[in-house]
Amino acid sequence: MTVEKQYGRLLKIDEEFGREKLGLMSGGVWQEDPKRLGIVLSRYKFVGKMLQGKSHVLEVGCGDAFASRIVAQFCDSLTVLDFDQIFIDDINNRENARWKMNAICTDFIKNKSGEEYDGVYALDVIEHINASEEDLFFCQASKSLKSDGIAVFGTPSLESQVYASIQSREGHVNCKTQEDWKNSLRKHFANVLCFSMNDEVLHTGFGAMSHYLLFVCVGKL
């Protein structure tokens, strides 16, 4: 037993579920830049609060889905997609009976999900999509939503790229300003609400001084 009895529950959780493992991507972050994991988790909490109470939610471009459990805590059911089978295998290998999610390997741009969801979100995804396919991606996201659904997108700002790592810059093929992303999203959603983050701090400040951009979209067109 633990010295303080209230911590005895931790031993019971460990016995029932085992010791939790980081995913392929989150594990790499924890090794190379531990503070970044806290920043990533805060982005997922924002999404969770925006989609709180939704029945069925879809994440596009989930990576290892380690942080996706935060969103799962706020909704009834979570489906996560990625086009890389390595990440989907990693998710399934770490499956947790208490926090089950449906993990699917598919290219979202080429293959519509086939379902309508109450919420759709994508964090750190749209900057990886070529500008020529951007409208198709948002069109797919809109089609995947119910009429009263909410979409949330998060992406690093164009202005932040001078501080991005070499690894990040290699994959970032479509970074924009807050205003440019808003204009792109308004082609597909009637209402686009803009938020910003600097590290884990959420705000509605000047877009050009924001490291990370978040868009909450309502009213699909």
Which residues fall in each region the model found?
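Conserved N-terminal segment of class I S-adenosyl-L-methionine
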Residues: 1-121, 132-139, 144, 172-180, ...
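A structural motif corresponding to the C-terminal end of an alpha-helix
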Residues: 188-190
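Short, glycine-/aromatic-enriched active-site segment of Class I SAM-dependent methyltransferases
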Residues: 153-173
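Short catalytic micro-motifs in class I SAM-dependent methyltransferases
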Residues: 124-125
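Short glycine-dipeptide loop
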Residues: 145-151
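Hydrophobic C-terminal alpha-helix "anchor/cap" residues
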Residues: 51, 185-186
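A short His-aromatic
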Residues: 128-129
